[in-house]
Amino acid sequence: MSLVPVVVEQTNRGERSYDIYSRLLKDRIIMLSEEVNDTTASLIVAQLLFLEAEDPDKDIHLYINSPGGSITSGMAIYDTMQYIKPDVSTICVGMAASMGAFLLAAGAKGKRYALPNSEVMIHQPLGGFRGQATDIGIHAERILKMKKKLNTILSDRTGKPLEQVELDTERDHFLSAEEAKEYGLIDEVIDKKK
């Protein structure tokens, strides 16, 4: 059972209560705090589009504490972040692993952050398939194409040579907040809100 806190605000019209995520959205804050899947991607894409419609010139802040998840779902979020007009600032709180790390790096350059004790993990895509040999071959080819695409984007986002990213993502590669900064996944480690 998931408990979502409620915030009560006093206005000149009386009291108004919001669930905490709706209240944060009012301040242009989106939380990715679970596995990336079709449901979370749809919610985040909708929030990004809503905030762009509200004010296309004001930054959006995406807080990430995620173990990663589906590549296609993550790419829907990534593409939307690049598509919309407002800059999307990303902030790692806790852990940004796999697709979570990819989305962290996808934030607007100069506006990608991590809290001091957060951790980032990059690796190659995971997948599995059962079936006929021909179908297994088709899926293996697809995952290799995805691996190349993800590594190319990470290389662009970090400034690291593609060969280095390919080597570093071959296995689980854990980085502290400072190491993530040195790697180019984030721009700054922050301990106080600006």
Curated annotation (Swiss-Prot):
Indicate whether Methyltransferase appears among the record's keywords.
no
Leader peptide range in chain numbering: none
Q: Where in the cell is it found?
A: Cytoplasm
Q: Which UniProt keywords apply?
A: Cytoplasm, Hydrolase, Protease, Serine protease
| Pfam families reported for this sequence | CLP_protease
* CDD domains with a match to the protein in the record: S14_ClpP_2
Record PROSITE patterns: CLP_PROTEASE_HIS (PS00382), CLP_PROTEASE_SER (PS00381)
A GO MF term: serine-type endopeptidase activity
Q: Give the enzyme's EC designation.
A: 3.4.21.92
Q: Indicate yes or no for the key word Cell membrane.
A: no
- Domain of life assignment: Bacteria
What sort of enzyme, by top EC class, is this? hydrolase
What is one cellular component GO term in this UniProt entry? endopeptidase Clp complex
Report the main location listed first in the record.
cytoplasm
SUBUNIT field: Fourteen ClpP subunits assemble into 2 heptameric rings which stack back to back to give a disk-like structure with a central cavity, resembling the structure of eukaryotic proteasomes.
Query: What is the role of this chain?
Result: Cleaves peptides in various proteins in a process that requires ATP hydrolysis. Has a chymotrypsin-like activity. Plays a major role in the degradation of misfolded proteins.
Descriptive protein name: ATP-dependent Clp protease proteolytic subunit
Organism, by scientific name, is Clostridium botulinum (strain Hall / ATCC 3502 / NCTC 13319 / Type A)
Name of the gene encoding the protein in the UniProt record: clpP
